Amino acid sequence: SAASDVYRRQAEDRDDVIWHEIHNAYRTRKIITGKLGGIEQLDNRKTVAVVDYKGFRVIIPIKEMMINLGRSPSGQEYADLMLRQNKILGNMLGADIDFIVRGIDSKTRSVVASRKEAMLRKRQIFYLDTDAAGMYRVYEGRIVQARVIAVAEKVVRVEVFGVETSILARDLAWDWIGDAHERFS
């Protein structure tokens, strides 16, 4: 029908506009934000995070997700670490994730990105560089906004301008919190 043709064309136009945004972000190395939608294993056995950016699938290799769990062990310790990493990623599902586009394929409209690069850039801007007055933007005692990226019963994981940290449930409020899920999600 004519109506469905119009609808299809509008959707294609919208996709073209969003693809143009992605392409520009790739060219300018601009930080963009999407929602963590899943964890998948590719045919080559590599695990990747899948982020949704306005309807486009963005693939982020696990090592570019910056889930920092310390040193890189081997054997059983490595298996345990991978399990912990996947659990953390599982708790992060639905979280807003900043990333920098590292590669695009215009034919297939596929996108590969790095969260790590975005996090390091934000650290540089907010913790290491100074503003016009020569002041750091983030410093001890300053109240800043944090992005909740994962919630478990006893702990909330937040990102503060490129730095991830955990806050224990008992430190989140003056009153008793039995389960952090009830207050933070």
Task: Set out the residue ranges of the language-model regions.
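Short boundary/loop segments of OB/S1/cold-shock single-stranded nucleic-acid-binding domains
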Residues: 8-35, 78-91, 117-140, 178-183
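Structural detector for short beta-strands of small beta-barrel domains
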Residues: 26-47, 94-105, 137-153, 185
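Acidic/polar N-terminal loop/beta-strand segments that form early-domain functional surfaces
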Residues: 37-39, 51-54, 62-63
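Short aromatic-glycine-enriched beta-strand elements
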Residues: 43-51, 109-111, 154-158
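Acidic-enriched and Gly/Ser
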Residues: 47, 58-104, 110-117, 181-184
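A short macromolecule-binding patch
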Residues: 56-65, 122-123, 164-176
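Surface-exposed interaction/gating patches
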Residues: 132-176, 181-185
